[in-house]
Structure formats: structure tokens, C-alpha cells
């Protein structure tokens, strides 16, 4: 039996209560969550969902269900007790993929992240915040191993946290940066298992109005790629946080390539060992930081992709991307290692005309050959859905909108998609966007490259 383990942050408690690994509080909202599971095989999947409390006990009897061949299923509300705060492990007889949406204060703020199909003994967290223009972070670490996990969190400011109690198998532990002492406004972290157990992590960034979520990194890359960068685009901006997990400083050049708007340009910074630096945000705003060199023109509109094209000391890097629109919307995603990309990518949640929500598929060819990309969609009732096709050169990106006036018109759709590009490798992210002008209705997640 194959299994898919992932952290699912679920708070169904009354306003004012928090979550933590100690007596500290965490979280600016009261939270609810949904789970979207996609069956990747042409056979019926029998799945079992285990809901673990933070003490390692199961919250409810394991939930068994089936998903049809190449089909998908949404769990909302989730089948756990009211007030559940913990994590989830999904077991399946077929290969599956999953994405979770987090909703704060009755949908006033929203975020999204994908499941983890494996754990690591060491995780990198490139962006944490404490009191940064109203933003703080907290993160959950889940035990994906086979026994109790003892862990240590080392922050880039030189501080560390070593909990006395272990994380029980399948369970998660919360770390709240707002409640921890002596942090700068922006920093990073390394999470390690001190007894060799496998871990996974999800980070939540939030103000009192906006929420972002991304996963901790277990693997690094010399040249991370980012399939969607927005700058000065209807108020949207992007910040990329690149972390150097190596032993020496390295000069990192990021090359920006337009897909819809803008001109190709570059940005160069030196990232010390164990530190992280912010890219994209300042050069496109026209306020480059000291020590930064760039050919990007501030104030110009840009929609495209980005790639690390120079890493002078060949150090291991990870990249996390934040997209935001002032104090209204925000969403985050993990940058990709192109060497782990494949010819197909799975997108477990695609929407159009769904209570005002629609999605966009943002895809990048990270291989060395020009190829034709085709995206197909699971049926929604008897409504026929278009197949999207585009030929992309190496390092070229494309954005497809599932919205009124675009590919789907006014057709309501809630389902999933699979994109294929024979002869090359692709990566993708999905933006979910609602129509509200007062609530944070931007959610972003990474497309999943299935394991062969």
C-alpha cells in the first residue's frame, strides 16, 4: 500500500484560543481547512485518512473512502471532531496527490499548500518573520518517520529551540515566532531530527488580514526555478526568499523572463552561508538594496518566470515565493528543483465560477527541449471542458486563466487537471483567486510531479 503523508493545519476552535508546543499562543485567526485528493492512476483508489492530535492519539476512527480512476474528491468540512488541531496521514492503494486550503475567520484570509509524499531528517525554512510590518509566522513540524521524533530548530539569528518532548508518530508540533524571544524582523531556520526520524513542515505567514502558507524544504537545488513572478501587475508584487544552506557565501544571479508582460532582466546578490536574501521585490519597485545589482527597471509591469542562472560557489539553495497585493491578498509557493521535474504535473484543485473563485495555471518548461504542453481536466457533470495546448521553448512559461472571458467562460467547474509535455520537463503552480475586495482570497499551491 502506498501512503501520502502531509501536514494539515486545522483549527476549529473558538476565537482567542491558540496552538503551540508550550504555553505560548500561535495564529492570528480561527481556522478551518479542506482536503482535496486526486487519484493519479486509472484504477479505483481505496484511501484511509488518519487524523492525529498533537499528542499522537487519533482524533476519530480512521476514515475510509474510495476515489474513482483518475478522479478527485474534496473533504469539506473535514471528518474530524470540532476543535481538532493536528495533522493527517493519508494511505492509498494507488498513487495520489493532495492539496489543503486553510481558511481564517470565516474566509477573511485564506492560504493553500500541497501534501508531502516523503519526509526528511533536515528541513530548510527560508522565510520567517516577527513583527515585520505587521507579519508574523508560525510553523508545524510533523513526524513522518517510524518512531518518536526528537527535534532541534536552529534560527539564522543564532538562537535555537530544542523541545524536551518528542513528536509522536504521525503527529505535529507548533512553533510560534511571535512568542519566541530575540528574533529579527526577517530570518530563516533549519529543523533537524536529532534521532534520525523523518520530518515534514508547513509554514504560515500572516498579518491580521492576510495569510500565506508554504512547505519546508527537504531537498536543495543549485538553480531553483519559479514559474510565476508578478510585478506592478494590477497591484500585485512578488518577493523571492532564497536561502543558502551551504558552508560558504555565493553570488546568486536570478534571471527574469517575461511570458505576458515585461522585459528580461537580472538581479545579483551575495548570500552568506546559512542566510537568506530577498529577490524580485526591491528591483521591480525601483529601490535596489545596498550590495544588489540589477538590470530590471523599477515600476515596469512584469508577468513571467524566474530562474537562478548563476550560483558562483555552487552552494545548495532553496527558494520561497510570496505574491501579494498590498493589504488585500497574499499567497506563497515553493520554488522548484528542475532536476526533479518530470514530463507531467498534477493539479488537484482547479475552479471556475465557484462562488466567485477561479484559478490560473502557471507552467514553465524547465527542460532542454522545445515541447508541446497539453492540459486535460476531469469532467464536471456532463459539461465538456476544453483541452489547453501550448508549445514552449526551454525556460519559457505560460499562464492559463480559468475565468469568465478566458478558457472556461462562464462554466462552473470544480475538479482537477493533469498537464503533459512529452520530451521535456515541466513545473507549475496554481493561483486560486476570489472576487472579494475586502477579504484575502488569493491561495497558491505547487503542481505535483508524480513519482514514477
Map each language-model feature to its residues.
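Sec-dependent, cleavable N-terminal signal peptides
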Residues: 1-26
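Gly/Pro-rich, tryptophan- and cysteine-flecked surface segments typical
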Residues: 20-452
Amino acid at each position: 500500500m502506498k501512503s501520502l503523508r502531509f501536514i494539515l493545519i486545522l483549527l476549529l476552535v473558538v476565537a482567542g484560543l491558540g496552538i503551540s508546543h508550550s504555553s505560548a499562543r500561535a495564529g492570528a485567526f480561527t481556522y478551518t481547512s479542506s482536503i482535496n485528493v486526486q487519484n493519479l492512476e486509472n484504477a479505483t483508489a481505496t484511501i484511509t485518512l488518519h487524523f492525529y492530535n498533537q499528542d499522537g492519539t487519533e482524533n476519530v476512527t480512521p476514515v475510509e473512502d474510495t476515489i474513482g480512476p483518475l478522479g478527485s474528491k474534496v473533504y469539506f468540512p473535514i471528518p474530524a471532531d470540532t476543535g481538532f488541531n493536528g495533522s493527517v496521514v493519508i494511505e492509498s492503494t494507488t498513487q495520489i496527490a493532495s492539496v489543503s486550503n486553510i481558511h481564517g475567520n470565516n474566509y477573511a484570509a485564506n492560504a493553500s499548500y500541497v501534501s508531502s509524499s516523503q519526509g526528511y531528517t533536515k528541513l530548510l525554512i527560508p522565510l520567517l518573520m516577527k513583527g515585520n510590518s505587521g507579519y508574523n509566522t508560525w510553523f508545524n513540524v510533523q513526524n513522518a518517520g517510524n518512531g518518536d521524533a526528537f527535534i532541534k530548530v536552529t534560527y539564522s539569528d543564532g538562537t535555537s529551540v530544542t523541545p524536551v518532548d518528542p513528536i509522536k508518530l504521525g503527529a505535529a508540533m507548533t512553533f510560534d515566532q511571535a512568542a519566541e524571544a530575540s528574533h529579527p524582523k526577517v530570518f530563516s531556520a533549519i529543523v533537524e531530527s536529532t534521532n534520525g526520524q523523518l520530518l515534514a513542515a508547513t509554514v504560515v505567514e500572516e498579518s491580521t488580514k492576510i495569510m500565506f502558507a508554504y512547505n519546508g524544504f527537504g531537498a536543495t537545488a543549485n538553480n531553483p526555478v519559479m514559474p510565476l513572478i508578478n510585478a506592478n501587475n494590477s497591484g500585485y508584487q512578488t518577493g523571492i526568499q532564497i536561502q543558502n544552506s551551504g558552508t560558504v557565501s555565493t553570488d546568486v544571479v536570478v534571471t527574469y523572463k517575461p511570458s505576458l508582460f515585461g522585459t528580461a532582466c537580472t538581479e545579483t546578490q551575495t548570500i552568506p552561508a546559512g542566510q537568506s536574501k530577498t529577490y524580485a521585490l526591491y528591483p521591480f519597485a525601483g529601490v535596489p538594496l545596498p550590495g544588489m545589482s540589477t538590470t530590471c527597471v523599477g515600476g515596469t509591469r512584469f508577468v513571467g518566470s524566474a530562474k537562478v542562472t548563476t550560483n558562483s560557489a555552487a552552494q545548495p539553495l532553496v527558494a520561497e515565493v510570496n505574491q501579494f497585493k498590498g493589504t488585500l491578498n497574499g499567497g506563497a509557493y515553493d520554488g522548484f528543483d528542475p532536476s526533479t521535474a518530470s514530463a507531467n504535473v498534477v493539479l488537484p484543485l482547479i475552479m471556475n465560477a465557484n462562488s466567485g473563485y477561479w484559478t490560473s495555471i502557471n507552467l514553465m518548461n524547465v527542460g532542454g527541449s522545445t515541447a508541446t504542453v497539453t492540459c486535460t481536466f476531469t469532467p464536471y457533470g456532463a459539461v465538456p471542458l476544453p483541452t489547453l495546448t501550448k508549445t514552449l521553448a526551454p525556460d519559457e512559461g505560460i499562464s492559463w486563466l480559468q475565468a469568465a472571458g478566458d478558457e472556461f467562460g462562464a462554466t462552473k467547474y470544480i475538479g482537477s487537471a493533469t498537464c503533459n509535455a512529452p520530451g521535456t520537463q515541466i513545473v507549475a503552480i496554481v493561483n486560486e483567486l476570489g472576487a472579494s475586495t475586502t477579504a484575502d482570497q488569493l491561495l497558491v499551491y505547487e503542481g505535483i510531479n508524480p513519482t514514477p
